[in-house]
Design a protein with these regions (language model features):
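Catalytic-core region of carbohydrate-active enzymes that cleave or remodel glycosidic bonds
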Residues: 95-167
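Active-site mouth of glycoside hydrolases
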Residues: 1-92, 96-103, 135, 156
């Protein structure tokens, strides 16, 4: 049964199931359509989602679709990776995927009080739900500096963006 005692229904596993051929074909067509529509716009960067908290395998599927589109069309997509910390580390540790990413955006992990807030991907929780569980404090400048510095070191050669409502 895909729900818990509080009656939340979890459908993310179905959504992110790229082993389902029909669903994977629909996703691939959608991704390619978006790439076709925006490829000539130099100010457009592709992102898997604004608040992506899904699993790494779906991001890899998305990047595989981008790579196959680039190979078929000879065009270059500009890609920003906006995921949870564990998913970003997993994806960027694979050279073929890291080569596709132009920018790593930090929105869903950060230091606060020198402790890392980094919810795991694929846990059926939106960013706001993760925050309610942990009740973190707002990061100060030193926390942000540490977060960005570590990302720059972890992802050499990539632009790093940091987003937070407080700054």
């Amino acid at each position: 049964v895909p729900f818990t005692g509080d009656k939340r229904i979890f459908t993310a596993d179905l959504f992110y199931d790229t082993q389902n051929k029909e669903r994977a074909d629909i996703y691939r067509q959608y991704i390619w359509n978006v790439l076709d529509a925006t490829a000539d716009a130099p100010n457009v960067y592709q992102s898997v989602s604004e608040e992506y908290t899904g699993p790494a395998h779906f991001v890899e599927f998305w990047l595989d679709c981008i790579a196959s589109w680039q190979q078929k069309t000879g065009r270059k997509a500009r890609v920003v990776l906006n995921t949870t910390h564990d998913v970003a580390l997993s994806v960027m540790s694979k050279p073929s995927y890291a080569a596709l990413v132009d920018i790593v955006e930090i929105e869903q992990w950060y230091y606060h009080g020198r402790k890392l807030y980094a919810p795991e991907g694929g846990k059926n929780l939106a960013p706001r739900q993760h925050l309610r569980l942990t009740r973190t404090t707002n990061p100060d400048f030193a926390d942000i500096y540490q977060t960005v510095s570590e990302a720059v070191a972890a992802f050499p050669g990539k632009a790093v963006l940091y987003y937070a409502k407080a700054f």
